[in-house]
Amino acid sequence: MSAILSADDLNDFISPGVACIKPIESLPSKQPQKSDNPYEVTTEDKVQAENPTPAQISLTDCLACSGCVTSAEAVLISLQSHTEVLNTLDAHPELRLIQNEQGTSLDPRSAQDDEGRIFVASVSPQVRASLAATYGVSEKEATSIIHQLLSGPHGLRAGGKHGSGFTWVIDTNIMREAVLVLTADEVSDTLASEAKDPSLPKKPIVSSACPGWVCYAEKTHPFILPHLSKLKSPQALAGTLLKSTLSKTLGVPVSRIWHLAVMPCFDKKLEASREELTDVTWNPADGQMFSQPQTPVRDVDCVITTRELLTLASARGISLPSILSKSSSVSFPSFPDKALDDYLFSKRSLSAQSMMTGTSGGYLHHVLTSFQARNPGSEIVAERGRNADVVVYKLVSPENGSIIEAARYYGFRNIQNLVNKLKPPEMSKLSGARRNDALGGKARMQLSSRKAAAKTKFDYAYVEVMACPGGCTNGGGQIRIEDAREANLTAQTGTPADTNGAASKPSPHEQRAWLARVDEAYFSAGDSEDETEASSKHFSILEREAGIHQILHYWSDLMGVPLSKLAYTTFREVESDVGKPQEGVNATAQAALREGTNW
């Protein structure tokens, strides 16, 4: 779905229509009165209407609408972009920090400036892989390029009104590891409760880290929502941890901490705008250092994609390959809390990425390996589904047989099959009855037998779902092969490439080869010597999970907020306004207005 979300090649955008919650109203244009005949009367049918102005649709409008998912998301491209990043850096000076034996603290002189901000960023591993494939560098070198751009002296800090840059840049892999551990706990608790605990998702638990999939489920298939994992995504969890701990330890309001996320997917812009992912959900009511209750502050202020990262550098006249050779690696100040500093900037990974973990974070793989560690002697067996984006896994024990079953579904073509399997029996009967009316008796019997067989085979404990075919390395915001060619040509010549020329469109074979190159960079992320040395001490998966639990509980104790409010979120059905009385539509508009729309 996300692969087509750009201003250049969007081909399914639906303009506001008669049933839109925000219709366009046109009034008759005023006709100049003729001085020679002041008594002339013009009938209404002869008055030409004014050309309607373009509809102004805000992010909240998208969340309140149940129309086409991709049409709503297309609006986000202009709302969160490299321009917002540059405008924010130019509008606010960077708050200065002091480092001494006591640790990192805020410079009192800098704190007097109400316009000052602390800028932090989080970057996904898929972004680094795409950048590495583009410039033919290692994943480690791609990481250095991003650090130099966002925080180095030759990057964003070299220009702008205030010379502002990002104080810390963290790897979302760190937060992914926390989500992996909590996911295994969630699956284990759900299986143990046998659907008796309403606070837990229903079996099968379906991953909720992909915002495109979540938005689709909320708007079109609300019966999926009880199955969705209640955990925040790594992006959202990073935002919560950074803003909560920096606000607490440095004594600054949450509103003065600005968090940028660099992601492979346009849908992450929509996720960052969810009202559930603001400081209101985790802030103590009596907190004096936090934002006011009536002004929710997003955990993630802005999301840009990998392609937009190139545009960000280009807008400041920065050549990404050249800044790699200009200076050494960026040194970030110590995080204000020692325990969290050790965690956020640790080089030891919970699990290395491989073909088995997939390209989307390895949620399913960690669930399997976690259960395998609790069942010594068990074995993971994989079986390919109807295509490469569907894989079924079983954890089997020689003594007890099958322990758990799980599956991976990537791409909306396969997601449709998953949705049909998750439909409640009543809905399946209703939809099936309508289809069967058009079929003959033999065809109906064959269809019923196939559906019955599918139902009997569907007994998964966990399903990893991603909207993009091939997973997150193929996200819609990733650098395409034609973008890579243009970026390299620009780097070689020093001038922007001519995009008006007749550039050849890459063939399907070239596109597959390009994606394989990005995947290779993604899987090579843990091969560097530094990380190998840091991981030389062997830790079992259960020991590493215990370490993650320890740091999460430490964070909860530091904030005085239960982990259920810090690491978990909620989802809700988005109801359609089509056919509702106008009062209902106005209520939606008023609710959106309260959330800060441009209406």
From Swiss-Prot:
Gene Ontology BP terms: iron-sulfur cluster assembly
Pfam families with a match to the protein in the record: Fe_hyd_lg_C
Record-linked SUPFAM superfamilies: Fe-only hydrogenase (SSF53920)
GO molecular function terms noted in the UniProt entry: 4 iron, 4 sulfur cluster binding; iron-sulfur cluster binding; metal ion binding
Taxonomy, superkingdom: Eukaryota
Residue sites binding [4Fe-4S] cluster 2 per the record: 210, 265, 468, 472
InterPro entries assigned to the protein according to its UniProt record, in alphabetical order: Cytosolic_Fe-S_CAF (IPR050340), Fe_hydrogenase (IPR009016), Fe_hydrogenase_lsu_C (IPR004108)
Record keywords: 4Fe-4S, Iron, Iron-sulfur, Metal-binding
Binding site for [4Fe-4S] cluster 1: 20, 62, 65, 68
Family the entry assigns: Belongs to the NARF family.
Biological role stated in the UniProt entry: Component of the cytosolic Fe/S protein assembly machinery. Required for maturation of extramitochondrial Fe/S proteins. May play a role in the transfer of pre-assembled Fe/S clusters to target apoproteins.
Name by which UniProt lists this protein: Cytosolic Fe-S cluster assembly factor nar1
Phylogenetic lineage: Eukaryota, Fungi, Dikarya, Ascomycota, Pezizomycotina
Primary gene name: nar1
